């Protein structure tokens, strides 16, 4: 029986553990979480979702307040065409965040940033180009292109001095999506350094329709590996979505030929995660029936989350002036639905109106009200111990990472704090 640590991931000659922690936004995969994994030689993601607002909270900047004030005149406008991000501010926020991160890196591991194309920010190509290049200029170890086909992303970076230096990868959910990306990126003369294949059991946005259950991670990994082999391409493939233990990771690698694993849900409840303790406890207490896939996101992608997510029962006025990360040509499905609801509410009983289909994802993600999780989140109770007061002991991120690497079969090592707690509370719930 093998442990994940007996395998290795080769990224352009650099040998690393075959495990990446996923980039969970907004600021769930915090800098502290990523740095704790990097310090032990691991691979960790941060997320670039809503970085101006993240910087405001971390560094006391005023990017969000400045944008809200500048765009205040359009608050009652039905379409937000003029509510644009200041590209200089976007660049400054990304630079500040990434520079702060990289200044504290040890160099033992690899720090990556997850960049979502679906954050169109009312000027998709301009803002995406700014975000990508600012991250490169600030010294990020690599960029994982997520939530979109990214048909233009390599072209947007090709003039950057670090275009061939930094590690660049992409998340796909089919060989078709990968083929489109490679064809459009070919003129740059650059191949991705790794490919993350995200299956239907992942948390958050899914790269499938509501027929997601018809797909499987092993089948897609094999499909992508065959696609690459047919074209003579040797690019590491990372399997993601639903891999809960080190033993499962080994099984996926051995059965599919994957070169590594990406995991996220177990890191969401780590001590260094940005989620509030109440959300982490909800994850630990979750049952299978609490985990749902819905159309709450205005991006058009299905999302997997806990049904207890506060956002699902809280329709808020669109905050496009302050945020507007999902605006595209001045509109988004939630903004449109809000306008229609307000029109229907004129002279009507609001309580009788149907519930909103979508949510203001910018606001709710920023406030940690969307509790996204993988399909196996109900197993989190296996990974720790519940205290007498009902709260759960949170593992350190490095403990989660090391357990993935070192555990064999179905075993899961308890956090050190949980082991100590059990010595004085042997009856504690696990």
Language-model segments: residues:
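Active-site entrance/lid segments in N-terminal catalytic domains of soluble metabolic enzymes
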Residues: 1-231, 402, 406-429
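Residue-level detector of alpha-helix initiation sites
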Residues: 28, 243-244
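A structural signal for short, well-ordered beta-strand segments and their strand-loop junctions
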Residues: 45, 144, 238-239, 262
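Conserved active-site-proximal phosphate/metal-binding subdomains
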Residues: 202-221, 227-238, 244-430
């Amino acid at each position: 029986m093998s442990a994940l640590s007996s395998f290795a991931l080769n990224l352009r000659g650099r040998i690393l553990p075959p495990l990446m922690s996923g980039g969970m936004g907004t600021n769930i995969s915090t800098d502290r979480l990523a740095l704790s994994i990097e310090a032990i030689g691991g691979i960790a993601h941060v997320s670039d979702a809503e970085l101006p607002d993240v910087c405001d909270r971390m560094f006391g900047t005023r990017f969000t307040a400045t944008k809200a004030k500048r765009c205040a005149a359009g608050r009652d406008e039905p379409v937000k065409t003029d509510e644009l991000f200041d590209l200089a501010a976007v660049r400054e926020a990304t630079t500040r965040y990434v520079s702060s991160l990289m200044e504290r890196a040890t160099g033992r591991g690899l720090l990556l940033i997850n960049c979502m194309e679906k954050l169109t920010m009312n000027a998709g190509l301009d803002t995406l180009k700014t975000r990508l290049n600012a991250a490169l200029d600030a010294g990020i170890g690599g960029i994982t292109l997520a939530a979109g086909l990214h048909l233009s992303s390599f072209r947007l970076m090709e003039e950057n001095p670090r275009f061939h230096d930094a590690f660049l990868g992409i998340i796909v959910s089919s060989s078709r999506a990968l083929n489109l990306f490679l064809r459009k990126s070919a003129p740059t003369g650059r191949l991705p350094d790794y490919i993350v294949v995200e299956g239907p059991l992942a948390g958050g946005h899914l790269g499938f329709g509501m027929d997601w259950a018809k797909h499987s991670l092993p089948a897609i990994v094999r499909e992508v590996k065959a696609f690459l082999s047919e074209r003579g391409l040797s690019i590491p493939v990372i399997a993601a979505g639903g891999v809960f233990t080190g033993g499962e990771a080994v099984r996926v690698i051995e059965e599919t030929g994957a070169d590594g694993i990406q995991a996220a849900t177990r890191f969401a409840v780590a001590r260094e995660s940005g989620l509030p303790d109440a959300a982490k406890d909800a994850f630990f207490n979750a049952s299978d029936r609490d985990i749902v896939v819905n159309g709450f996101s205005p991006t058009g992608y299905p999302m997997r989350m806990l049904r207890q997510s506060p956002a699902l029962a809280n329709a808020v006025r669109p905050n496009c002036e302050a945020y507007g990360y999902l605006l595209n040509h001045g509109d988004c499905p939630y903004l449109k639905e809000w306008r229609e609801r307000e029109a229907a509410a004129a002279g009507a009983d609001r309580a009788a109106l149907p519930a909103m289909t979508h949510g203001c994802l910018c606001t709710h993600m920023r406030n940690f009200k969307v509790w996204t999780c993988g399909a196996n989140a109900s197993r989190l109770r296996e990974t720790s111990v519940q205290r007498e007061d009902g709260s759960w002991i949170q593992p350190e991120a490095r403990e989660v990472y090391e357990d993935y690497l070192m555990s064999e079969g179905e075993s899961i090592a308890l956090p050190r704090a949980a082991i100590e707690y059990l010595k004085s509370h042997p009856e504690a719930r696990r």
